[in-house]
Amino acid sequence: MALVGDFRQFESFFALYPSLMEVKNYLTQALTIDSAVYKRINALAGTTENTRVEFTYELGGNIRAIEQTYPLKSHTEAFYESHKKFVDFQLCVEGAEYFEVGYIKDFTPLTPYNESKDLTIYAKPITPPHRFFFHSGILGIFFPQDVHAGGLTYPIQSHTNAQDTTNITDLLTQPKKVVLKIPIEYFA
């Protein structure tokens, strides 16, 4: 079951997993304006607005931090994925994006599991997945049964003019975030 919420709400979660204290400390630094981690993530920028940039850092204990920024895409272009060996902790530091998340049994794999990438790719489900809005400070934790797609935008409809639809991309800025890859063994 995916967990999504303000990072400050996860105190009791981290209390259940003392082995994740380094993860909690790193995520705290990612949101602390004067920390080196925050400054590094906030400085991520491509040569153009539509460039994906990412850097990977080893945190120890087989935990990786992928600090990244990327252009947003329409929800119709969602890339649905899941992982077997790692749990994703995705924290938005700056900017914003939508995520779609659903239960693995509601999706049909497009590709077989790729063990070297720890990745299965899925087709868009018939049943609409849950939609979450990520902005600065929002953490999503995605377990192996959680198929997820991030970096999404949605058209919005004006409350005053039913004919007026605006792509929310115009209202969002490219996310600057971190994805922590945590081995599933930490949750056994």
Region spans (language model):
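A short beta-loop-beta micro-motif enriched in histidine and acidic residues
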Residues: 59-60, 75-88, 107-110, 127-128
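Short, structured patches in soluble enzyme cores that scaffold and shape functional sites
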Residues: 69, 91-93, 103, 144-146, ...
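A short, N-terminal "cap"/entry segment at the start of jelly-roll beta-barrel domains
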Residues: 1-66, 79
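A short hydrophobic beta-strand segment most commonly corresponding to one strand
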Residues: 89, 139-141, 158-188
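Acidic, glycine-rich flexible loop segments
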Residues: 121-129
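Conserved metal-binding segment of the jelly-roll/cupin
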Residues: 132-154
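Short histidine-centered beta-strand/loop micro-motifs
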Residues: 75-83, 90, 101-102, 151-152, ...
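Glycine- and acidic-residue-biased ligand/ion/polar-headgroup-sensing regions
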Residues: 85-87, 91-101, 106, 115-122
